[in-house]
Amino acid sequence: MFLLYEYDIFWAFLIISSAIPVLAFFISGVLSPIRKGPEKLSSYESGIEPIGDAWLQFRIRYYMFALVFVVFDVETVFLYPWAMSFDVLGVSAFIEAFIFVLILILGLVYAWRKGALEWS
């Protein structure tokens, strides 16, 4: 029971940091005026009226490029701490990182063979 007193500051911080955004959204929702009109329903593109249908569907190629980018971005996030502590971790960490990079390279080769990286 006495060990729970060590976490009082943590719980207070968690409650306050959760309450502030909730209160901000609630207060802005209550106090903001709601005006519906044709300007609110029209799409806005750099101050120019759009020509044609404003709701265009993106091609799947954009999503595939974004997905491949995210995978290799996450790889960088995981490999940076490993590279900074390489001399401390030893050979087993090197083998694990090598297997990790090998799996990602196999995924890249698979995406390349399936044509996910081609822009045509």
From Swiss-Prot:
Regions that span the bilayer: 9-29, 64-84, 88-108
Organism: Barbarea verna
Subunit structure: NDH is composed of at least 16 different subunits, 5 of which are encoded in the nucleus.
Name of the protein described by the UniProt record: NAD(P)H-quinone oxidoreductase subunit 3, chloroplastic
Sorted UniProt keywords: Chloroplast, Membrane, NAD, NADP, Plastid, Plastoquinone, Quinone, Thylakoid, Translocase, Transmembrane, Transmembrane helix, Transport
Gene expressing this chain: ndhC
Enzyme's top EC category: translocase
Pfam families: Oxidored_q4 (PF00507)
E.C. number: 7.1.1.-
Family listed: Belongs to the complex I subunit 3 family.
Molecular-function GO terms, alphabetical: NADH dehydrogenase (ubiquinone) activity; quinone binding
One GO BP annotation of this record: photosynthesis, light reaction
Compartment annotation: Plastid, Chloroplast thylakoid membrane
Membrane topology according to the record: Multi-pass membrane protein
